Amino acid sequence: MRKLTALFVASTLALGAANLAHAADTTTAAPADAKPMMHHKGKFGPHQDMMFKDLNLTDAQKQQIREIMKGQRDQMKRPPLEERRAMHDIIASDTFDKVKAEAQIAKMEEQRKANMLAHMETQNKIYNILTPEQKKQFNANFEKRLTERPAAKGKMPATAE
């Protein structure tokens, strides 16, 4: 039973670490004439579209946002090859080394923090190119998103019992 539990924990950590590595992975920019993918919802990605909804951005502001986003994409790096190999070595070993796994996870968490910090900095740069009226609308949109509960996609409504 202990081996089964250890295997389950190791698998869970490995899949979680793989998801973190996948989430940190960046993609190359699409050609300018390419249509956005359905889940990307617009020119600026899935969340940027909502951030700037109803703000009536000027062409100059849109260009500035594109430049800021391009700069952020250049900063976002995929985990180094040696980190991905180290993660694979932990997963593929005959025995699970918890200390080694925790050290690898800590290293990945540092990278995730750096990515989140860069993301917040980018959003601040974009916010600061808005006019005062656009900032007011942006803040109203933000408050609206906080108070409204999003509809769950693909889930059936709960039945009353």
From Swiss-Prot:
CDD domains per record: CpxP_like
Q: In its keyword annotation, does this UniProt entry include Chaperone?
A: yes
- For whether the record's keyword set contains Chaperone, the answer is yes
Induction is noted as:
Induced by many sorts of periplasmic stress. Produced upon spheroplast formation, not induced by growth in 0.5 M sucrose or 0.35 M NaCl, nor by mutants that have a leaky periplasmic space (at protein level). Induction is partially dependent on the Cpx envelope stress response encoded by cpxA-cpxR; does not depend on sigma factor E (rpoE). Induction is also partially dependent on the Bae envelope stress response encoded by baeS-baeR; cpx and baeS effects are independent.
Which residue intervals are annotated with compositional bias (Basic and acidic residues) in the record? 142-151
The UniProt disruption phenotype note reads: No observed growth phenotype. Increased levels of degP and rpoH transcription; may induce the sigma factor E regulon (rpoE). Loss of about 50% of periplasmic alkaline phosphatase activity; very sensitive to tannic acid.
The listed locations are: Periplasm
* A Pfam family per the record: LTXXQ
Outcome recorded upon mutating residue 123 to L: Increased chaperone activity, substrate affinity and chaperone flexibility
Q: Which residues form the signal peptide?
A: 1-23
One GO cellular component this record assigns the protein to is: outer membrane-bounded periplasmic space
User: What GO molecular function annotations does the UniProt record carry, in alphabetical order?
Assistant: protein folding chaperone; protein homodimerization activity; unfolded protein binding
> Could you give a single Gene Ontology term from the biological process aspect?
chaperone-mediated protein folding
Q: What is recorded about the protein's domains? A: Has an elongated cradle shape.
**Role, per record:** An ATP-independent periplasmic chaperone, decreases protein aggregation and helps protein refolding. Binds substrate over a large region of its convex inner surface. Substrate protein folds while it is bound to chaperone. Increasing Spy flexibility increases its substrate affinity and overall chaperone activity (shown for 3 different substrates). Protects proteins in vitro against tannin inactivation; tannins have antimicrobial activity. Overexpression enhances the stability of otherwise unstable periplasmic proteins.
Against PANTHER family, the record matches this protein to:
PERIPLASMIC CHAPERONE SPY
Name the chain's protein: Periplasmic chaperone Spy
